[in-house]
């Protein structure tokens, strides 16, 4: 399993970091088999697998439940678990308790915290307590509703300068890596050049130190409409739907189960069953 130090080495050597967002045992298992460097158990599970229209409905219990499953599927991969909405906003004490729960109860190696500004003391406290932190800036889904919705961040000069300040504060607070979501590729490149910690982009261009996409988006699995920054590498929906339809057809036509998928009794046992009748 890689460590935080390994990710810094990868940045310095120009080796790209592969992060895959996965929410359960089978998806995390496949991500590990594919050679992912990091698996993110994101609160986007609210949208992707729980059917919510926002991540704000995801609870600590949800994150722990899915984090434990993902860890069982990928025991040898570095796992990052999201701090869900309001789990690190009320007090430093609450932040530490929730961060500790995520690490202890899921087996994750780190937590991810959205935002800067008022979140800086919380990031610093987590790191001082021995909990590795990934910061998340740009489009931050937990606060999208109050920041103008789901759109690209940092497109004007003032917003870009503010983000440059924010990422440096996150680094100084002790974050060991940074997720950059939906920002101009030029800004992402500038940030990546100016930071010593690795950057992982999602909708942030090719010049970040790594990339992250959601398992379901990569495979076109259960997603209705993918964002612009998503590239699908397979169409699992078509394959799975065909399999389910074939199953239903064979049940109705009595072609399933056939002898290959059925069990039998010995002839003498059948006689016992039938009371000696032939």
Curated annotation (Swiss-Prot):
GO molecular function list: 3-methyl-2-oxobutanoate hydroxymethyltransferase activity; magnesium ion binding
The protein's annotated pathway: Cofactor biosynthesis; (R)-pantothenate biosynthesis; (R)-pantoate from 3-methyl-2-oxobutanoate: step 1/2
The protein's enzyme class: transferase
Keyword Magnesium: yes
InterPro entries for the chain: Pantoate_hydroxy_MeTrfase (IPR003700), Pyrv/PenolPyrv_kinase-like_dom (IPR015813), Pyrv_kinase-like_dom_sf (IPR040442)
SUPFAM superfamilies the record matches: Phosphoenolpyruvate/pyruvate domain
Compartments (UniProt record): Cytoplasm
A GO biological process held by the record: pantothenate biosynthetic process
Keyword check for Cytoplasm: yes
Enzyme Commission number: 2.1.2.11
Cofactor(s) essential for the protein: Mg(2+)
Active-site residues annotated for this sequence: 181
Sequence similarity: Belongs to the PanB family.
Alphabetical list of NCBIfam families matching this protein: panB, PRK00311.1
Stated name of the protein: 3-methyl-2-oxobutanoate hydroxymethyltransferase
